[in-house]
Amino acid sequence: LFLLSRFQELDLKSLQDARGAKMFATISEIANTWKIANDEMLDFDEIEREDFLLGHCLKSISLRLESDQYIDFSLMIRKTVEALESDNNEINSALSETKHLMVDEYQDVNISQERLINGLYKRMESVFVVGDDDQAIYGWRGADVRNIVEFDQRHRNCSVHTLSTNFRSTETIVSASDRFIQLELSTARINKSPQAHSNGNIQQFGNFWFNTRIEEANWITTRINDLIGIK
C-alpha cells in the first residue's frame, strides 16, 4: 500500500515505463528488490550504478520512509545492524545489561540477520543457537544454511548438543526421511542419526513420484477424500 499510494512520487512510473511492465508487476519487482537489498545489506549506490532507475527508486523509497516515519522489518534489521557496526555509544549502553543471546530456527537466518546476531553477540558473554539444517527451506528468500552448518568452525570454543530423538514421527518415517536427505545433501549436512521415540502404528508408507506439481496435488486431494470417505 505504501508503494501504491506513492507510485508517482517515488518515480516508480519511470521504472514501469522502462520495463514495459504493468503497474502491479512494477510494484512487486521493487518490493522484492527492496527486501533483498536490505536482507543482503546491498549498497543502493552500487545498485544505482548497475541499474540507475532501480537504484534511484530504492533511494527514493528509503528517503520517503524516513520522512513519513515508516519502517518495515527488513529496514529495521538493516538500521540496527548499521548502528551495531558503527559502535554507537547509545547501543552499547542499551545492551550493557544483556549478557546472553538465544536464537531459534537458526537454519533460516539470512545475511542481515547473521550480522545482527554477530553485532549483538560481540557485546555479550554467550550466544546459544538452536536449529536443524535438515529443515532449512527458506533459501529462496535469502536464508543461508551454512550459518548453522559451519557455526562450530566460526566459533571454535563452542559446545554442540545434539537432540537426536524425534517425538513427532514413527521410526519408519524418521529413517526414510533421514536416508532421503542424506542422498540429497550428503556431506553438506551436519552429521546426525535421528531416532524415533516410538514406532507407532504404521498403516501405509510408500514413495510416490509425479511428473508435475498439479499431478501431485490431484493425487493428494484424491487420497485425502478416499481416507475420509468422500467419493
Language-model region placement:
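Conserved P-loop NTPase-based nucleic-acid remodeling module centered on helicase motor cores
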Residues: 1-25, 149, 222
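Alpha-helical scaffold elements adjacent to nucleotide-binding pockets in ATP/GTP-utilizing enzyme cores
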Residues: 2-6, 116-119, 147-154, 172-180, ...
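Phosphate/oxyanion-binding loops and surfaces in catalytic or ligand/nucleic-acid-binding neighborhoods
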Residues: 6-10, 30-40, 127, 154, ...
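Short helix/loop segment immediately N-terminal to the Walker
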Residues: 15-19, 86-97, 190-197, 229-231
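Helicase P-loop NTPase motor core
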Residues: 156-159, 165-231
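Generic hydrophobic alpha-helical segments
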Residues: 3, 61, 80, 84-87, ...
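Charged, alpha-helix-enriched surfaces in structured cytosolic catalytic cores
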Residues: 2, 25, 71, 143-146, ...
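Conserved helicase NTPase motor core
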Residues: 48-150, 162-169
